A protein has these predicted regions:
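Glycine-rich, flexible loop motifs
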Residues: 26-83, 92-93
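Short, surface-exposed terminal/edge motifs of secreted or surface/virion proteins that either
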Residues: 93-110
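Disulfide-stabilized, aromatic/cysteine-rich ligand-recognition loop
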Residues: 214-216, 311-366
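A short, polar/charged loop-to-alpha-helix boundary motif
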Residues: 297-310
Length: 366
């Protein structure tokens, strides 16, 4: 540790000199607003003007308003459905050149021989996938703009998810990949959770929902969510995030994986209509989702200790052997019209391991 700057009117002491390297050392990202990158048009995001950003040891840039599109990709000609993209500000290496913006699938630094972790800085990102068209209040509309008017269920598009755009200052506490902003300092996964292969969970397009088939119950869902910095939602958080998801159908999977003839879960994010106003997929149907709310069976009368929690986890004092219940939301693959954004089942106990119950996660803002 030592003094970085001193006053020396003769400038003979190196510590008196203000250099780019010193400014880079002390500069974070200084922005007038947390959301210094925003969705601005179909296939485009805009970096706002006036942010000061250090890149590596030799560059400090002040941003101008800049629109970024697929033309900024480091590889490929267009965005890919179901992919997370990362936005980098890059130092081209000479004092005469301004910053360069690159959009990449890589989460470390962009592709290309000239780029590495010394001359690039990740400043944000977004997800490209299914978006539900809404009015200014977030209500689903049909192609004529009528709220829940005829045919509203199919009025979706493939685009940058506007509420998936994140920055270093506007993001969840966890990895922001595969998440959208729900408002009120809360983020939610875009996809029902699948197994990340490391005893945690992930939100990815075309993933297989994790359920009791992989040993999931309410307790394990919470443990896996915690390992990746997330948590289970309560019922209100779930219904808000799921709003705009069409009600299920008995005889069709057009609005979600809900037809009563279905036999099992399916890959997430594949049904065009099955997206909420917050651009979250499969909230109605496919598998039930564990919620962070409990209740007790009011009809029980046989109060006692019940050894139902599994070996080594203690016992539950209840009015019957399944007295404690955990809510599950949304419906599953064969529930038909029972599926929906407010659908709830109050009969499942938290130690239940069921092939039709999965999990969807949220995370608080950083």
């Amino acid at each position: 540790m030592g003094r970085l700057f001193i006053y020396d009117e003769n400038m003979t002491d190196e510590r008196a000199k203000i250099t780019v390297a010193k400014m880079a050392d002390i500069s974070d990202i200084v922005a007038q607003e947390k959301e210094y990158i925003k969705y601005s048009a179909k296939g485009a995001v805009t970096v706002s003007a006036g942010s000061v950003i250090a890149v590596g040891e030799m560059a400090v840039f002040k941003t101008a308003e800049t629109v970024l599109t697929k033309a900024n990709l480091d590889q490929g000609a267009d965005f890919t459905h179901g992919s997370d993209y990362y936005i980098y500000i890059c130092d081209p290496g000479t004092n005469a050149q301004d910053e360069v913006y690159v959009i990449s699938l890589n989460s470390t630094f962009p592709d290309g021989e000239v780029w590495d972790d010394t001359n690039t800085r990740k400043i944000g990102g977004f997800h490209y996938g299914r978006v539900r068209n809404t009015d200014d209040y977030g209500r689903p509309v049909n192609t004529s703009g009528s709220v829940r008017g005829s045919g509203w269920e199919s009025n979706t598009r493939v685009d940058i998810l506007p509420n998936s755009v994140w920055t270093t200052k506007h993001r969840p506490k966890c990895d922001p990949s595969g998440m959208v902003y729900l408002g009120n300092a809360l983020w939610g996964d875009i996809y029902i959770s699948s197994d990340d292969g490391a005893n945690g969970l992930q939100s990815i397009y075309d993933g297989t929902p994790i359920t009791g088939t992989e040993g999931l119950n309410w307790y394990i869902a919470g443990e896996r969510a915690r390992r990746v910095g997330k948590r289970l939602p309560d019922y209100m958080e779930f219904t808000v995030a799921a709003d705009g998801s069409p009600q299920g159908l008995d005889a069709s999977n057009a609005n979600g994986w809900t037809a009563t003839t279905n036999k099992a879960r399916t890959a997430v994010g594949k049904i065009a209509n099955a997206v909420s106003s917050f651009n979250i997929c499969d909230m109605a149907g496919n598998v039930w989702k564990w919620l962070n709310e409990l209740l007790h069976d009011p009809t029980g009368a046989s109060w006692a200790w019940y050894d139902v929690l599994g070996g080594g986890y203690g016992q539950a004092y209840m009015a019957n052997s399944t007295g404690l219940h955990a809510l599950i939301g949304g419906g599953d693959w064969g529930n038909g019209v029972h599926c929906g954004s407010r659908a709830v089942n109050c009969s499942s106990y938290p130690w239940n391991v069921a092939a039709n119950i999965g999990v969807w996660c949220v995370c608080d803002s950083l």
